């Protein structure tokens, strides 16, 4: 359902050389030596310039029904991931147990469906939000959601998890 690739040091260095926004975000995150606050992370992503063409040259997509996680950098305090979706691909309904998540929509339209659990522990949709390029979404745990690409084009989101995503719950829809 999900494919994961960690960028090689060479690809990451090439991306950082071509994409000042990504380089600056990594420098800021590395300078903290701690877990950044979600509000500040969202603010920084909101003003982050991303060289889309440079980023696209370093990303891959999966062709199955899932999505692709392109890990740019991971430390003990954060994980930066460019996630790609082809048309019709989505995540399972999930949470981020123990991690906060903020993401910037780089290309395409991202659809976030928010869920709450009913008495049977099944996920019931309560809200749907659409994000365009340049929009930022910041989700505190235990936010339960699904991200999907409901368009005919590709979708790229730049995610930062704090601390790195080490576990998550998967939920069945009601």
Set out the residue ranges of the language-model regions.
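Conserved short histidine dyad/triad with adjacent acidic residue
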Residues: 81-96, 140-142
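A short hydrophobic beta-strand segment most commonly corresponding to one strand
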Residues: 102-103, 152-168
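Glycine- and acidic-residue-biased ligand/ion/polar-headgroup-sensing regions
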Residues: 87, 98-118
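Short acidic-glycine-tyrosine-enriched beta hairpin
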Residues: 102, 117-144
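N-terminal leader/capping segments at the start of a protein or of a new domain
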Residues: 1-53
